[in-house]
Each structure stands twice: as structure tokens, then as C-alpha cells.
């Protein structure tokens, strides 16, 4: 089976949203061993559902400008200052205050699965 795809837009997405898209591929029969293994891996590491990840991404927009950084935060859902700081180093051009980091943690904790 051969597909011809054209990329119209490109976005960074959290793990749980990627998992949703891969599940759609599997459900339509467009699966392979690699796709199945990727789905299984994402299923094992997702910390929140796709709706919660989308909400985290949206709420973080006012604090974290870069989409790639928001996607990593919504994927791994860090809950300590140190964990958040370890992600924020991805964007060395922005300095985040302790207050901003605490707000990031509050947003994530609203949606993270226990």
C-alpha cells in the first residue's frame, strides 16, 4: 500500500496526542510493527489523556512561548521545580522566575493522572 502525503502544517504535540493519532492509524488498518510498538510505548509513558494535554498546552501559552517546550512539559508532566527547570533549559533565551515555574506546576497538577 502506497501513500502520498503533503505536509501542510507542522506542530509539536504531547505524547498523549501523538498516541491518539497513532491509534487512529491502527484502527484504520494502517498499522505496522513499528507503529504498534510506538503506540505501546506511548501508552506506557503517557501521564495524562489527550484532552488534559491539550488543556495544559493551552494554559501554558501565556507563560511558555515555545510550542516545543510546552509539548515536552505536557508530555512528561513534571511536578517539582527541579523537574520543570530541567525542561525549561531547552529555551536558553528565556529566563523563568520561580513564580512562573510554580504556576507551570499548578497547571500541570490540575490535569496529571495520579
Curated annotation (Swiss-Prot):
One of its GO terms (cellular component) is DNA-directed RNA polymerase complex. The keyword Cytoplasm applies. Keywords: Cytoplasm, DNA-directed RNA polymerase, Nucleotidyltransferase, Transcription, Transferase. Coiled coil: none annotated. Its EC number is 2.7.7.6. InterPro entries: HRDC-like_sf, HRDC_dom_sf, Rpb4/RPC9, Rpo4. One of its GO terms (molecular function) is nucleotide binding. In purified enzyme appears as 5 forms, each differing by about 200 Da of a covalently bound, negatively charged residue. Not glycosylated. Its main location: cytoplasm. It comes from the Archaea. It holds the Pfam family RNA_pol_Rpb4. It is found in: Cytoplasm. One of its GO terms (biological process) is DNA-templated transcription. It catalyses: RNA(n) + a ribonucleoside 5'-triphosphate = RNA(n+1) + diphosphate. Part of the 13-subunit RNA polymerase complex. Forms a stalk with Rpo7 that extends from the main structure. HAMAP family: RNApol_arch_Rpo4 (MF_00864). Belongs to the eukaryotic RPB4 RNA polymerase subunit family. DNA-dependent RNA polymerase catalyzes the transcription of DNA into RNA using the four ribonucleoside triphosphates as substrates. This subunit is less well bound than the others. Probably not involved in transcription initiation. NCBIfam families: PRK14981.1-5. This is DNA-directed RNA polymerase subunit Rpo4. It comes from Sulfolobus acidocaldarius (strain ATCC 33909 / DSM 639 / JCM 8929 / NBRC 15157 / NCIMB 11770). The lineage of its organism: Archaea, Thermoproteota, Thermoprotei, Sulfolobales, Sulfolobaceae. The gene is rpo4.
